[in-house]
Design a protein with these regions (language model features):
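Extracytoplasmic "Venus flytrap"
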Residues: 24, 40-59, 78-83
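Short, well-ordered beta-strand elements
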Residues: 37-50, 71-75, 181-185
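N-terminal secretory signal peptides
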Residues: 1-12
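Short, polar/charged alpha-helical segment
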Residues: 50-74, 192
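Short helix-initiation/N-cap motifs at beta->coil->alpha
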Residues: 76-89, 187-189, 201-209
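Cleavable N-terminal signal peptides
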Residues: 23-24, 33-34
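Alpha-to-beta junction loops
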Residues: 69-71, 87-104, 183-185, 199-201
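Contiguous mixed-secondary-structure segments that line small-molecule binding/active-site clefts
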Residues: 2-4, 61-64, 102-206
Length: 209
C-alpha cells in the first residue's frame, strides 16, 4: 500500500514539474532523464587465491546484490596496483577506493594493529574477536588507532579469521627448545613472540608467499 502511494506521488510530481517548466520558460525542451552511471569502487585484495580471496569475492557479491546496478566493486588481486604493505596508504591517498586485508599487515606502522586480527596461535576465536570489536569497545580503539596514525580511513570488519595454527614442521615439535633457529613465516604480534623464542622469523603477507 505504501509503495502504491509513493508511485502516485512521484507521477504527480513529474507531471507538475513539466507543466511548471513549460509555463515559465515557454519553448524549453525537456531532456530525457538518463539513469546515473553506476559508482565503481576499485578495491585491492591482499590475496592471490584460496579461501581468503573467496571470502573477498563473497563480500563483493553481497554488496552487488544489495546495491543492484548502482554500485560496482572492481576487486583486484594481490599486488595489482600496490604492494600489500602499501595498501593502507594507497586508500588514504585515494589511489585505491578500498582494500581487503588484515590489520596485521601494517604491523610495522603500529604493533597495536595486530590486536585486531591475526594474533599469535592459541588466541581467541573469530567469533570472540568480532564480539570484542562490536560489543566490547574494540571498534572504538581501532578508530583511535587510525586517528593516531593520521589515516583518513573507515573500516568494516568482515570475514573474520581465527588465530593462525602454530605451523607445519619437518619434524615433530615436542619441546620449545626445538624451535630455536627454525625459519618461520608469520605476520603481526606472533612474529615478536616467536622471535623471543629464538626462531628466525620472516614477516610476509600470505598473498606474497
Amino acid at each position: 500500500m505504501e509503495e502504491k502511494k509513493q508511485k502516485v506521488t512521484r507521477r504527480k510530481f513529474v507531471k507538475g514539474s513539466a507543466i511548471a517548466v513549460a509555463g515559465a520558460a515557454g519553448a524549453v525542451a525537456m531532456p530525457n532523464i538518463a539513469r546515473a552511471a553506476p559508482v565503481t569502487l576499485k578495491v585491492q585484495a591482499a590475496w592471490g587465491g584460496g579461501i581468503f580471496l573467496e571470502n573477498a569475492k563473497s563480500y563483493v557479491d553481497r554488496v552487488h546484490a544489495m546495491a543492484g546496478k548502482d554500485l560496482k566493486i572492481d576487486l583486484l588481486s594481490v599486488n595489482s596496483v600496490v604492494k600489500t604493505s602499501q595498501m593502507q596508504d594507497a586508500v588514504h591517498r585515494g589511489v585505491l577506493d578500498g582494500a581487503h586485508y588484515v590489520p596485521a599487515y601494517w604491523y610495522s606502522k603500529s604493533k597495536a594493529a595486530s590486536l585486531f586480527g591475526t594474533g599469535p596461535c592459541f588466541g581467541w576465536s573469530a567469533q570472540e574477536l568480532l564480539g570484542w570489536i562490536h560489543y566490547g569497545g574494540g571498534m572504538e580503539l581501532f578508530n583511535e588507532l587510525m586517528g593516531s596514525l593520521g589515516l583518513n580511513l573507515v573500516s568494516f570488519f568482515n570475514s573474520p579469521m581465527p588465530a593462525q595454527p602454530l605451523g607445519w614442521f619437518k619434524e615433530q615439535i615436542k619441546d620449545a627448545s626445538q624451535m630455536k633457529g627454525l625459519k618461520y613465516r608469520t605476520v603481526g604480534l606472533a612474529a615478536d613472540v616467536l622471535m623471543e623464542m629464538g626462531m628466525s622469523v620472516v614477516q610476509l603477507p600470505g598473498g606474497e608467499i
